């Protein structure tokens, strides 16, 4: 697969030998999710030092939430295949509903959030990493919905802490975790080989929001902007049946399809993912924040032609 000559023409980074990196992984789906485990294994096999600091359980759509002033507990994965995987929990007050303590206030063990997991990782699990990768998320994080994304916001925390970060999301129905991991690992290798003039993996203060289309439809790679467009939007509804048949007639927060994109959305990441492109959208820790697009385009374009489209051989 090839990208356009225009994308391949620009570029200022110089190829360098690849080195083993210290990489912190996190997600918003829990430390046992197949995607993060596959990425851990792929990066380790490529020679990198990799550690996981993730929520205990699914924390999708938690955005930038975190619980402050509460005691936390850190656990370690008991699967010997993932000896460097850690998770975070805390407690919350709630009403007991069992017969033995009905109506009483009790402490309920709950998962830490994605932001909390990255903060833990940067402080205790792998201080001063070369790179933070959050994901791969099962479901794309696109456009305006990034503001609610635990994946995106956790990566933003890393960028704000001075660490280059990738927020990685795949198609919701994509089940090929090893292939997703191989593509991300290949991108990491490209970042390492095409460092910036100062030796950094990415321009200072910049992260990348990476979204993958269904892999069987992958057409190429595209440098995009996060933008505002997203094919669906959140709303309150009196009937959640369209989201889950078991919730028919029940009220709650669901989704509705958005109108088609217009000319103003032409370079938005959601538009290009829908066309079958792997998208790389630079961000500086805030959704839609302005960035020097020309400078970033020149710095990142080599990755599109030389890294993300040619998958590593098995």
Predicted regions, residues:
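Alpha-helix C-terminal capping segments
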Residues: 121-127, 153-164
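Charged helix-capping and loop-helix junction motifs
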Residues: 147-153
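Active-site-proximal beta-strand/loop segments in catalytic clefts of secreted hydrolases
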Residues: 26-29, 53-58, 110-112, 134-138, ...
């Amino acid at each position: 697969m090839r990208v356009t000559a225009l994308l391949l023409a620009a570029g200022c980074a110089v190829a360098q030998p690849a080195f083993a990196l210290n990489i912190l992984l996190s997600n918003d789906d829990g430390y046992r999710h197949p995607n993060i485990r596959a990425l851990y294994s792929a990066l380790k096999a490529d020679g990198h030092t990799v550690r996981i600091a993730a929520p205990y359980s699914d924390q999708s759509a938690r955005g930038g939430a975190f619980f402050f002033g509460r005691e936390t507990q850190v656990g370690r994965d008991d699967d010997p295949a993932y000896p460097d995987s850690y998770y975070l929990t805390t407690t919350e007050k709630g009403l007991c509903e069992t017969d033995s303590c009905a109506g009483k206030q009790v402490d309920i063990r709950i998962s830490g959030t994605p932001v909390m997991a990255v903060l833990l990782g940067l402080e205790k699990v792998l201080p001063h990493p070369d790179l933070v990768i959050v994901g791969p998320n099962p479901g794309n994080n696109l456009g305006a919905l990034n503001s609610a994304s635990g994946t995106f916001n956790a990566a933003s925390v890393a960028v704000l802490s001075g660490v280059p970060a990738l927020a990685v999301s795949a198609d919701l129905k994509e089940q090929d975790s090893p292939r997703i991991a191989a593509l991300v690992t290949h991108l990491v290798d490209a970042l390492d080989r095409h460092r910036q003039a100062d030796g950094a993996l990415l321009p200072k203060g910049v992260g990348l929001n990476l979204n993958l289309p269904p892999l069987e439809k992958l057409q190429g790679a595209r440098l995009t902007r996060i933008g505002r467009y997203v094919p669906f939007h959140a709303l309150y509804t009196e009937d959640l049946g369209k989201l889950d048949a078991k919730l028919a007639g029940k009220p709650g927060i669901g989704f509705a399809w958005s109108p088609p994109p217009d000319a103003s959305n032409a370079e938005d990441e959601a538009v290009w993912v829908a066309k079958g492109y792997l998208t790389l959208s630079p961000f500086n820790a805030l959704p839609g924040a302005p960035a020097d697009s020309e400078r970033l385009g020149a710095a990142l374009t080599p990755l599109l032609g030389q890294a993300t489209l040619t998958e590593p051989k098995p």
